[in-house]
Amino acid sequence: MKVLVVGTGAREHAICDALKDDVELYAYMSKNNPGIAKISTYKIGDEGEVDKVAEFAKENGIELAVIGPEAPLGKGIVNALEDVGVPCVGPAQESARIETDKSFMRNLFEKYEIAGSVVYKVFDNFDDIDKFLDEFDRDVVVKPVGLTGGKGVKIVGDHLRDNQDAKLYAKEVFETEMGGFAKVILEEKIVGEEFTIQAFCDGEHLVAMPAAQDHPHAFENDQGLITGGMGSYTDTDGLLPFLSQEDYDAAVAIMKDTLKAIAKETTPYKGILYGQFMLSKDGPKLIEYNARFGDPECMNVLPLLKTPMIDICKAVVAGELKEAEFEDLATVCKYIVPDGYPDTPHAGEIVEVNEEGIEKLGAKVYYAAVNEEDDGIHLSGSRALGIIAKGKTIAEAEEIAEKACGLVKGNVYHRRDVGTEALLQKRVDHMKSILDE
């Protein structure tokens, strides 16, 4: 079966890796990702030019496509591919609004009375924000409505000093039309521990994957700017050290209700639904949805998959999704990034990756924002590659991943604390202190 994967990063490399043994693999990517290039017939091009992607698919007789990144989903890539007869693991443009338009998501929760929502308000002029924040007595989160690559959200107490500071940032979002809209969402700040649940969806049925926890801050001990994610981990039981089965099930129930609401409001949602939750003293609260796999969380869950990925993909597009089986192992993923990231990254320099040594340790490497040229693999300005390891415990997986990171040479760094016992205990203690209040 001819399968096309659209996208350039480590997430797409992981998707390709999960499919490669069972399909004739094609890829459409914006840069020469060395990992994807090795295992596919590929074309370098702009993934956002959806008609050209559809033309490539038609010319090559593609029978199914898997869409990696969010931007092409927002531009209607699934609609374009389906118009030329290619079914997709990825939602149509209308349903992808669950990620591409945060006001659509919040309004959906309100209209269908879905659990796990937060106090929020959507603004289309600054004067109303000014008045609202003068009267609102809780800390807020400021969110652009559209896509910002995971870097547009700012939180009082983390990136912003107070609600007056939030006003200034909200004004910046308006004036620059950050995310493509002159709109801002203000939400109450929820205190707790973040976690992610990703799920396969066929429009009606939802199959949830193991929970993961991302580490968005650029530097160790949760310091620095918010990034697309510096690493993540999963545990052997599909839960997390601070996450109970009851809270996991409650989060999945929220996702199932969302799936039903999307079908009523737009078109049946077929693809990956990524729920980012905050576990609060009142249970899971939905922070946001993504309309695709997480990056890095995709790299945690797909290597655990026992059910062939292609079987799941075919079930998704056919509306016949039943189950997916995962190994009972823990995983730790650590992202290697250029020195200076995210502010002033060292782009263009060569990074040396000892793939053979990494594999001997039992780890995997998934290439992200790099470009392979004749003289080697060059860094760009973003995350370079993900190192993923499995183990019988999180500690075992972390030890393997950390050793593997030492086999990447260049002007790069990574968060050594991702998956460590000290950081996990910090998460557990934090959650306990919230529940004990």
Predicted feature locations:
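Internal nucleotide-binding/catalytic subdomain
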Residues: K154-F293
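Short arginine-rich
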Residues: E177-G179, K403-V418
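Active-site "cap" helix and flanking loop/linker of ATP-utilizing ligase/carboxylase catalytic domains
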Residues: A251-Y274, N290-K360, E372-E373
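Short, well-ordered beta-strand elements within core beta-sheets of diverse protein domains
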Residues: R383-G391
